[in-house]
């Protein structure tokens, strides 16, 4: 089987590295997705272990269609009965069509649904399907007349780890937060600071990475209710994930924010994630932070225009943050994600490198400043 790990634009290479680390085979990278081959064990592992992917799909088919009749026949040719139970719910929950002859999303959805029903009629010898049991959500995307039909095994997006208690303003997705940590090359024996932590997502994801806590071990997935996958697979891989957790390391992760309520929520989130003892939370303006070490890494998702503040406030904030870093964290490495176009000017320093990413649909750049000891922040 071919599986698809979807990815936010800009994070495909990070998801690829995760897939390689999990031992998946024949990995291929495309815009917005990473494909790999495997069996149901790999599908379960992908859902439980991937930190930066949004969802995991089974790739049911890829074909060219220039007419609705071609679309119908190609969708009907898929062996749906091998996956969908007799009373399973099989909505076509998402359709996209770009630069294609067949562009009507509603027509693509209607024709494809009809094709699936006709296929299942042949298998189950019935005219009506109740669709009141396990969920088999179907996604169809078409680009330049090439259709990809996918079956969603995740259900809720993988960013839903299960630890976020209360949403505050403009939270960063857990999948993106984990990617920021990976891209920083931070190591668990190094100091980490998030000086504008909000509800603590970056610090929590860093602690989970350091502890090797699988992000999906404590949540459920749509495919757990599919009869085609042995329940024991889910149990065994979860047990494996729990046994692989590393509680031996002493972590030095610091997270602070000027908003007291955000820190309260951050502590609740950390407790739910099982890392409350690994992070030192403080209610504090970043200007008042004293350096916890000579070397370290700062990873922040500060407020920016489309989300929380106007340009004048943002420029002042970034200018002050640049001064703070230069004065208090002179030998540290800094990693800042923002959509503000003039960030480097306001911060007062040109980044060593930057990377285009998307945060909640907003185009951002991840500015990376390598410190004196970018390959090791040990003190």
Where in the sequence are the language-model features?
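Non-catalytic nucleic-acid substrate-recognition regions in nucleic-acid-modifying enzymes
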Residues: 1-134
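Residue-level signal for inorganic ion chemistry
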Residues: 19, 92, 140, 301, ...
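Short, charged/polar, Gly/Pro-enriched secondary-structure boundary elements
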Residues: 41-48, 156-159, 375
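A short, flexible beta-alpha/helix-coil linker loop
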Residues: 97-100, 157, 303-307
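C-terminal edge-of-domain segments
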Residues: 138-154, 367
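SAM-dependent Rossmann-like transferase core, predominantly class I methyltransferases
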Residues: 149-183
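Conserved S-adenosyl-L-methionine
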Residues: 172-291, 306-307, 311-315
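C-terminal catalytic and target-recognition region of SAM-dependent MTase-like enzymes
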Residues: 285-288, 292-379
